[in-house]
Every structure is written in structure tokens, then in C-alpha cells.
Amino acid sequence: MSDMHSLLIAAILGVVEGLTEFLPVSSTGHMIIVGHLLGFEGDTAKTFEVVIQLGSILAVVVMFWRRLFGLIGIHFGRPLQHEGESKGRLTLIHILLGMIPAVVLGLLFHDTIKSLFNPINVMYALVVGGLLLIAAECLKPKEPRAPGLDDMTYRQAFMIGCFQCLALWPGFSRSGATISGGMLMGVSRYAASEFSFLLAVPMMMGATALDLYKSWGFLTTGDISMFAVGFITAFVVALIAIKTFLQLIKRISFIPFAIYRFIVAAAVYVVFF
């Protein structure tokens, strides 16, 4: 594989990762399709995916850095407020409660979860996750009990964490599971999305660090330029995607995302079966 070809693949996969990681459409489903079509699979590809996820995580940190520092009691001037936010009552306890269920299950069943990573399971997860998005839109309270992040209760945070366990099923989508769970628990669509992004930082950093540690042996100096291009591309695209997504959900429901998931599931079937 030539250097230019490798860099092109890195850029393409960086765009795919950045666009899909925080949208409720399953980055996993997209990555396995695109990776397969590009012929980029195997241990190096898996390590590459882990590295570019760090770029997506960094985009959330940049986007919500004031809020993240505020969670640990560090404030810089007047806190930035996003739509639906109030006086800064969201605490680190909310984040911890949202993390606990998936962390416990993830550690207990790590090997089993990894064994589920195959096209057929991803295809089913795409469909079930799409149905959950539709259910969340249809069954959510007419008036959210938590219109903003700072209106969320500890119980709501914990229940969102329970829904996040669904994302241990490869292809389900972590953001899809948490946002749907939040809406069903009475959190507004916008606030549930923001909480999902904040929750992603410790969850994804922990999971990515573990995967990177286990994949370290597959890294070579020859891969540095390719990994750097993928990382930077994923960061820039994720930053744009997050901003656009938060504006978009003010105007539309998640039904279009659910339909899109069904289309991706069909694409997985066509490509792999």
C-alpha cells in the first residue's frame, strides 16, 4: 500500500469516524462497511480505529471544556451556557452515575462483548437501535421534566447509564442508547444529547485507553503519518458534526436517524451477505 493511498484511506475513515461517532447512527456499522470496501481490515485497522476515536473525543473536550472543568469545580469566568442549560447544577455525581452500569458490565463481560463484533450482530443492533429511537420519540413525555442539563436528577442520570449498557452490543450506538434513554426518562432531546456528549468523554477515554494498551504491539513508526491524518481528520469533522447536530435537533426529531439506521443495516447485509 503506497503512502498516498494509506493517507487517503486514513482521511476517508477519519471523516466517517468524525461524522458518525456522536450521532445516533452507529460509527461501528459505518466503519466496518467502509473499512471492508477499502480493503482496510485486520489488527492494524482495529488499532487505527482506536486512535482516531481519540480525535473524536478531543472534539467533545474542546466543545464542552468549560462545562467539563465546571464538573470538577473549576470555573473560568461566567460559565458558557448552551440551550436548555441553567445555573450549573449538573455535577460530577451525575456523570459517575451515568458511567457505573456500563463500566461494571463492560469489565465483567469484556471478552464476550468483543466476540459479538461481527457484521451479523452489528446489523441487528442497527435495527434494534433504530426501533429504540422511534420508541423514544413516540413515548417521551409531552413536556420534559428536565428541559436542561442542570434540571436532571441523579435517578435520570443513572437510568441513562443503564440504557448506555445497550451500547455494549456492537453497532447499537452509544449516543443512540443514551439519548433515547434520556428522552424516555423525561429529559429534553437537546439536554439528553448534551449529556450523552459529556458522558462520552470518560467512557470513551477509558475504553479507548484499554483498547490502545492491548493493541500497542501493532503500532509501528511507519504508521505514524497515517494515524496522524486519521486523528486530525476525525477531530475536525467531529467538531463540525457535533455543532451541526445540536442545531439540527432543535428542528427535527430522531425519526430520520432511525430510518437511516435501517438503510445502513440493509447495506451491511448487502456488503457482507
Swiss-Prot record:
Enzyme class: hydrolase
EC id: 3.6.1.27
Pfam families: BacA
GO biological process: cell wall organization; peptidoglycan biosynthetic process; regulation of cell shape; response to antibiotic
Membrane-spanning segments: 6-26, 45-65, 90-110, 116-136, 190-210, 222-242, 252-272
Gene Ontology CC entries for this record: plasma membrane
The keyword Glycoprotein is annotated on this UniProt entry: no
Catalytic activity: di-trans,octa-cis-undecaprenyl diphosphate + H2O = di-trans,octa-cis-undecaprenyl phosphate + phosphate + H(+)
Keywords: Antibiotic resistance, Cell inner membrane, Cell membrane, Cell shape, Cell wall biogenesis/degradation, Hydrolase, Membrane, Peptidoglycan synthesis, Transmembrane, Transmembrane helix
Main location: membrane
Membrane topology of this protein: Multi-pass membrane protein
GO molecular function, one term: undecaprenyl-diphosphatase activity
Location of the protein in the cell: Cell inner membrane
Annotated family: Belongs to the UppP family.
Function: Catalyzes the dephosphorylation of undecaprenyl diphosphate (UPP). Confers resistance to bacitracin.
Any further remark recorded for this protein: Bacitracin is thought to be involved in the inhibition of peptidoglycan synthesis by sequestering undecaprenyl diphosphate, thereby reducing the pool of lipid carrier available.
Name listed for the protein in its UniProt record: Undecaprenyl-diphosphatase
Lineage: Bacteria, Pseudomonadati, Pseudomonadota, Gammaproteobacteria, Enterobacterales
